[in-house]
């Protein structure tokens, strides 16, 4: 099964239109269905990305302060006496577990605030530097280290301060209740379903910094229908039907457009019949206007028109 992620309409193509709406929102014009003004951000200021939370010591002096104030021994941290040793420690795969143990203490909050917080993407590459906006957000970062130690991902919601630097608004464990049905089928040992879920989820390997990527990531972790319906198409075909061998998921694309004063992204899944080559498409729609995306349409037939 071949999956392909394409962007039919980029946010840049809509920039002039987007800025025009933004000008209205700055004047406090409210949307028709809410009490607060619509908030749109130019230049893709919002982030909705999946990855792992890690942290590093920015200086040797902070590492020594951590060593002295925590119950960890020098042997646990490794002998760090110079910048080379510090770099070695920062690359240590066991560091998140050690930091979780030490930074969980309220006495070490001042050290936690000085740490260099990082989001690694799902492929393990350093993607963003993170800035907690409050004591609560710092607590979330520390707690997220426990997920990293178990190789469990988080969803980061935030806004860009500058290139590569993100202010943290919220951290959400990626094992969401919305995927409970999916998880139960995975536990059943269904190899075909497991492979399908892994393939679709692999599309979360993006930076989550465009409306298209934010919508895609939201759907992947908040809409179980994507997996359940795709499995039906691919593996629950009707023997007497036109495609007894089922369908293949051949393409996933995102179309973002302005609907009134709201930005709506349609995440479209294209299926092709193995026997006939006939195609059909289904979509999930997400409102990506504000910092927190939300689902508008769970699963509906997509009919393309020109």
Identify the role of each PLM range.
Residues 166-171, 248-251, 262-268, 291-303:
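Short, well-ordered strand-loop elements centered on a beta-strand within folded domains, enriched
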Residues 272-301:
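A short, surface-exposed beta-strand/turn
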């Amino acid at each position: 099964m071949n999956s392909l992620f394409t962007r039919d309409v980029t946010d840049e193509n809509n920039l002039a239109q987007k800025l025009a709406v933004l000008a209205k929102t700055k004047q406090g014009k409210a949307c028709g269905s809410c009490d607060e003004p619509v908030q749109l951000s130019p230049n893709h200021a919002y982030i909705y990305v999946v990855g792992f939370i890690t942290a590093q010591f920015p200086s040797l002096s902070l590492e020594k302060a951590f060593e002295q104030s925590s119950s960890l021994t020098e042997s646990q941290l490794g002998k760090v006496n110079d910048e080379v040793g510090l770099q070695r420690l920062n690359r240590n795969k066991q560091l998140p577990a050690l930091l979780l143990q030490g930074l969980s203490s309220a006495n070490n909050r001042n050290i936690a605030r000085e740490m260099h917080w990082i989001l690694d993407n799902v492929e393990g590459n350093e993607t963003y530097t993170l800035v907690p906006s409050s004591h609560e957000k710092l607590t979330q970062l520390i707690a997220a280290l426990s997920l990293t130690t178990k190789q469990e991902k988080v969803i980061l919601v935030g806004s860009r301060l500058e290139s590569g630097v993100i202010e943290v608004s919220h951290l959400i464990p990626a094992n969401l209740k919305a995927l409970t049905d999916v998880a139960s089928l995975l536990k059943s040992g269904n190899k075909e379903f497991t492979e399908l879920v892994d393939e679709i989820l692999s599309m979360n390997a993006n930076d989550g910094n465009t409306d298209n990527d934010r919508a895609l990531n939201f759907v992947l972790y908040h809409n179980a229908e994507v997996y359940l319906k795709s499995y039906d198409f691919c593996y629950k075909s009707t023997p007497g039907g036109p495609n007894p061998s089922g369908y293949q998921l051949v393409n996933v694309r995102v179309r973002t457009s302005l609907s009134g004063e709201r930005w709506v992204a349609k995440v479209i899944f294209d299926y092709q019949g193995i026997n006939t080559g006939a195609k059909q498409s289904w979509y999930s729609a997400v409102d990506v206007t504000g910092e927190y995306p939300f689902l508008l349409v769970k699963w509906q037939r997509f009919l393309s028109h020109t």
